[in-house]
């Protein structure tokens, strides 16, 4: 069978899968890739206080955690209680990374600490939600809009106040 053009053995497929997996693992980390930021560290520690030590995953274009090829800044994965930061999509923008970490971290608080009940009331959210975010939130399922809007608002407060709320 080795003479048939394009045919590979199981061994070759296994070796290729192992190489692919090795490359994939290198794109995942519990710390930001090539970025040293005490500010990100402090925010991350607050999230880890809620979810546990290995609760933030930094993905640099990883396929495994759903970042590659999608316009995602990050997400909170309820099933694993895991904040996934799609660092490759941020193009090194620290302010954007911080905003996303606070936003996704707040989703963790909403789920883990508040049982899906918003911290802010509708008037507080409406008064603080920027128009562009209000428009964007309409792309979400109606049941998710209030929590998504709140996470966008909470992400904008200063770090010390955010950490205190978490």
Predicted regions located by residue number:
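Active-site scaffold of zinc-dependent metalloenzymes
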Residues: 64-95, 111-112
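Short alpha-helix carrying the canonical HExxH Zn2+-binding catalytic motif
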Residues: 93-109
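N-terminal low-structure segments adjacent to metalloprotease catalytic domains
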Residues: 1-23
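Metalloprotease/metallohydrolase-associated module, dominated by Zn2+-dependent proteases
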Residues: 118-166
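Acidic/histidine-rich, surface-exposed loop or edge segments in extracytoplasmic proteins
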Residues: 16-31, 78-84
């Amino acid at each position: 069978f080795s003479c048939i053009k394009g045919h590979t053995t199981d061994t070759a497929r296994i070796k290729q899968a192992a190489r692919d997996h090795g490359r994939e693992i290198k794109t995942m980390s519990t710390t930001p890739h090539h970025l040293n930021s005490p500010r990100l560290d402090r925010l991350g520690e607050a999230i880890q206080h809620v979810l546990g030590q290995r609760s933030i995953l930094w993905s640099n274009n990883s396929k495994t955690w759903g970042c590659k090829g999608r316009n995602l800044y990050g997400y909170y994965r309820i099933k694993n209680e895991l904040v996934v930061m799609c660092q490759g999509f941020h193009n090194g923008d620290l302010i954007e990374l911080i905003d996303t970490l606070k936003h996704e971290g707040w989703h963790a608080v909403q789920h883990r600490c508040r049982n899906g009940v918003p911290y802010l009331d509708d008037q507080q959210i409406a008064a603080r939600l920027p128009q562009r975010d209000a428009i964007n939130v309409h792309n979400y399922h109606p049941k998710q809009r209030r929590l998504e809007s709140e996470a966008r608002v909470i992400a904008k407060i200063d770090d010390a106040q955010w950490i205190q709320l978490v």
